[in-house]
């Protein structure tokens, strides 16, 4: 395909539970040309965690959705980064195979998973493409809110959104690769979530104004409408325990 001044760009999304593919740490398990894998640390990690928490906070405040206005959430947790979830996400991203791998954590427990693929006729590189595309990829997942009616149950058409705002999910870890597929240059984002969301018969969160204490949670210092887990802290003098809020660094 000939290049033009306005490069062609398109996106694909896929949702866990639709099907699985085998994954490994190998680079491009097909005819695609591997061009790089981004180590998501520093500003790259902060960006992907922050955009997830932005959308969670927006939803928990009752400000998400237009046609289907979403109710506020009592108990939505602030997400923090998880290295185990990220390492498994990197393995899948590096295969260059667009499909789910039935992700499980180091304890063999299932994880939730969202994947997205964006392609352009113009070459970039792994760092620049992540900077330009990652926010839009996560936004595409979240934008399924337009089709979601709270309490309607799981749907493959809105499952990216419901995983992003699943209240009990507390950890996220992502991987990103960049490769050439035919004449197209592709960025592949994989995010794994712990514990997983999208349980059949369950709503993504408890409806109501934020009430962290009601659910034995602390209030986030970074997001007005999100909660954080409490860690037990032992008092060395008395032997008693106290609870302290755990905040994202």
From Swiss-Prot:
Leader sequence segment: 1-26
Residues listed as glycosylation sites in the UniProt record: 57, 127, 168
Protein's cellular compartments: Secreted
PROSITE patterns in alphabetical order: CRISP_1, CRISP_2
One of the record's GO cellular component terms: extracellular space
Gene Ontology biological-process entries: superoxide metabolic process; suppression of platelet aggregation in another organism
Annotated SUPFAM superfamilies: PR-1-like
The organism's place on the tree of life at top rank: Eukaryota
Residues annotated as domain SCP: 50-193
Keyword Secreted: yes
InterPro entries: Allrgn_V5/Tpx1_CS, CAP_dom, CAP_sf, CRISP-related, V5_allergen-like
GO MF term (any one): heparan sulfate binding
Keyword Signal among UniProt keywords: yes
Keywords assigned by UniProt, alphabetized: Antioxidant, Glycoprotein, Hemostasis impairing toxin, Heparin-binding, Metal-binding, Platelet aggregation inhibiting toxin, Secreted, Signal, Toxin
Tissue: Saliva (at protein level). Salivary gland (at protein level).
One Pfam family cited in the UniProt record for this chain: CAP
Names of the cofactor(s): Cu(2+)
Subcellular location, principal: secreted
Function: Antioxidant protein that scavenges superoxide radicals. Removes superoxide radicals produced by PMA-stimulated host neutrophils. Inhibits host platelet aggregation induced by low doses of collagen by interfering with the pro-aggregatory properties of reactive oxygen species on platelets. Binds to heparin and sulfated glycosaminoglycans.
Family per similarity comment: Belongs to the CRISP family. Venom allergen 5-like subfamily.
Extra information: Does not affect blood coagulation. Does not interfere with endothelial cell proliferation. Does not exhibit vasodilation activity. Does not inhibit the complement cascade.
Quaternary assembly: Monomeric in solution.
Protein name as it appears in the record: Salivary antigen-5
Species of origin: Dipetalogaster maximus
């Amino acid at each position: 395909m000939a290049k033009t001044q306005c490069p062609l760009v398109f996106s694909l999304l896929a949702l866990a539970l639709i099907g699985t593919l085998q994954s490994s740490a190998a680079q491009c398990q097909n005819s695609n040309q591997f061009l790089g894998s981004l180590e998501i640390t520093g500003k790259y990690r902060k960006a992907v965690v922050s955009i997830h928490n932005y959308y969670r906070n927006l939803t928990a405040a009752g400000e998400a959705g237009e046609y289907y206005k979403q109710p506020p959430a009592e108990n939505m947790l602030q997400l923090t980064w998880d290295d185990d979830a990220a390492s498994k996400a990197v393995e899948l991203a590096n295969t260059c195979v667009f499909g789910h791998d039935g992700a499980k954590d180091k304890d063999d427990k299932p994880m939730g998973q969202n994947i997205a693929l964006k392609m352009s006729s113009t070459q970039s590189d792994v760092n620049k493409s992540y900077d330009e595309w990652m926010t839009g990829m996560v936004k595409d997942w979240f934008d399924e809110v337009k089709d979601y009616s709270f309490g309607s149950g799981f749907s493959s058409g809105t499952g990216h959104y419901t995983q992003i705002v699943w209240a009990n999910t507390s950890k996220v870890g992502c991987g990103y690769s960049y490769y050439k597929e035919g004449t197209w240059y592709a960025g592949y984002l994989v995010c794994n979530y712990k514990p997983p969301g999208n349980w059949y018969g369950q709503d993504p969160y408890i409806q109501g104004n934020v009430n962290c204490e009601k659910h034995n949670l602390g209030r986030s210092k970074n997001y007005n409408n999100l909660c954080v887990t409490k860690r037990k802290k032992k008092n060395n003098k008395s032997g008693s325990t106290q609870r302290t809020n755990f905040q994202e660094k």
